[in-house]
UniProtKB/Swiss-Prot annotation:
It is an enzyme of class 3 (hydrolase). Keywords: Apoplast, Aspartyl protease, Disulfide bond, Glycoprotein, Hydrolase, Nucleotide-binding, Protease, Secreted, Signal. PROSITE patterns: LIPASE_SER, PEPTIDASE_A1. It comes from Arabidopsis thaliana (Mouse-ear cress). Belongs to the peptidase A1 family. Its main location: secreted. Glycans are attached at N140, N148, N184, N211, N297, N353. This is Aspartyl protease AED3. One of its GO terms (biological process) is proteolysis. It holds the Pfam family TAXi_C. The gene is AED3. Its EC number is 3.4.23.-. InterPro entries: Aspartic_peptidase_A1, PEPTIDASE_A1, Peptidase_aspartic_dom_sf, TAXi_C, TAXi_N.
Length: 449
């Protein structure tokens, strides 16, 4: 049985993907520094991560541009989810050589005795999977889950009802012996893996969740797999949210820290207790073709006091085409359908009113930082909710501090040109609350540090 009540929530410490030079306490300790039941989360590139590169630039814009270089893979992946009926091989991922995806990771423990795993949080995925011992093509055998070391590990048979919930099944049509539930999937736009459906004990802070189901990756290829797997927070039956409904009531929220500090941290809360009381909600829309994605009804965008003219076809939710707007934790820069972005950009440039603009990486509207004080705020209008983005979520500065850029972009033409994505850069220092049973999402300002 789980060790906490239905209303238990936990705090997950989130950090930024930067190099740490000093520390006032042991930030890599498994337990929370204050002795609470918080479950620690660390940045995938930080010193506490086993995947941290030797050298990481501390420049905010360099870090953002580096992470945003993976957005094209992410958008291709999201596009594949909503473009028509999903194919058997059109979901999760694995890679072997290079990390291209995942900005925040959570420390979770699996097995008996518990093995510490660092798993990427993904709101647009409904699966939980990780590389297991003996995986061919996985990035590092030392970071894999050792199934032989867990006394509570077990496989799931093809004959079980749960096996039918996995996409890309490869179970034999007939077999004299019960076969292990196996499947093939893809993720991130350029990666694929084969896995077995298994069960083991999942430990989240003090909560012990027996018989938790997840994909145990046996072989992988491509460039998009988080080295120790993924923790899907979508609405599908195999996600963390769905498998822990009796414990956390299908409610979770997160507050992502700003990219402007070495030490800022944020939190992820699971369950009803501790969620903000003063928060405004907008309905969640459900796409039956891909129910895991968290769609919202974006009705318009204002730049300053001007609501920009946009053809409703680029904002209207359409389950058949996948059109609409989603909130996603894995994309770095908010992307709009090109006509929507151009309308926002042109009005923004008009109000900034400088003689010329330059381009920097993914950003095409950069100007002298001396004119930053005239930059207008951008408001996203949703049903029953107007989200006025803080300036730190709208502008980003060059390494030298001489340029300021509008930190949004259009969707490239060969991606799904009708899917708008509200990304993590624009979600920072906001509490984003997902209330799945009541089909709503709440947003409120909150300092996430």
């Amino acid at each position: 049985m789980a060790s906490s009540s239905l209303h238990f929530f936990f705090f997950l410490t989130l950090l930024l993907p930067f190099t740490f030079t000093t520390a006032t306490r042991d930030t890599c300790a498994t337990a929370a520094p204050d002795g609470s039941d918080d479950l620690s989360i660390i940045p995938i590139n930080a010193k506490c991560s086993p995947f941290a590169p030797t050298h990481v630039s501390a420049s905010v814009i360099d870090t953002v541009l580096h992470m945003a270089s993976s957005d094209s893979h992410r958008l291709t992946y999201l596009s594949s989810l909503v473009a028509g009926k999903p194919k058997p091989t059109s979901v999760p991922v694995a890679s072997g050589n290079q990390l291209h995806i995942g900005n925040y990771v959570v420390r979770a423990k699996l097995g008996t005795p518990p093995q510490l795993m660092f798993m990427v949080l993904d709101t647009s995925n409904d699966a939980v999977w990780l590389p297991c011992s003996g995986c061919s093509g996985c990035s590092n055998a030392s970071t894999s889950f050792n199934t032989n070391s867990s006394s509570t590990y077990s496989t799931v048979s093809c004959s079980t009802a749960q096996c039918t919930q996995a996409r890309g099944l490869t179970c034999p049509s007939s077999s004299p012996q019960p076969s292990v539930c196996s499947f093939n999937q893809s993720y991130g736009g350029d990666s694929s893996f084969s896995a077995s459906l298994v069960q083991d004990t999942l430990t989240l802070a003090p909560d012990v969740i027996p018989n938790f189901s997840f994909g145990c990756i046996n072989s992988a290829s491509g460039n998009s797999l988080p080295p120790q797997g993924l923790m899907g927070l979508g609405r599908g039956p195999m996600s963390l949210v769905s498998q822990t409904t009796s414990l956390y009531s299908g409610v979770f929220s997160y507050c992502l820290p700003s990219f402007r500090s070495f030490y800022f941290s944020g939190s992820l809360k699971l369950g009803l207790l501790g969620q903000p009381k003063s928060i405004r909600y907008t309905p969640l829309l459900r796409n039956p073709r891909r129910p895991s994605l968290y769609y919202v009804n974006l009705t318009g965008v204002s730049v300053g006091s001007v609501q920009v003219p946009v053809d409703p076809v680029y904002l209207t939710f359409d389950a058949n085409s996948g059109a609409g707007t989603i909130i996603d934790s894995g994309t770095v820069i908010t992307r709009f359908a090109q006509p929507v972005y151009e309308a926002i950009r042109d009005e923004f440039r008009k109000q900034v009113n400088v003689s010329s603009f330059s381009t920097l990486g993914a950003f095409d509207t950069c100007f002298s930082a001396d004119n930053e004080n005239v930059a207008p705020k951008i408001t996203l209008h949703m049903t029953s909710l107007d989200l006025k983005l803080p300036m730190e979520n709208t502008l980003i500065h060059s390494s030298a501090g001489t340029l300021t850029c509008l930190s949004m972009a259009g969707i490239r033409q060969n991606a799904n040109a009708v899917l708008n994505v509200i990304a993590n850069l624009q979600q920072q220092n906001l509490r984003i609350l997902f209330d799945v049973p009541n089909s709503r999402i709440g947003i409120a300002p909150e300092p996430c540090n």
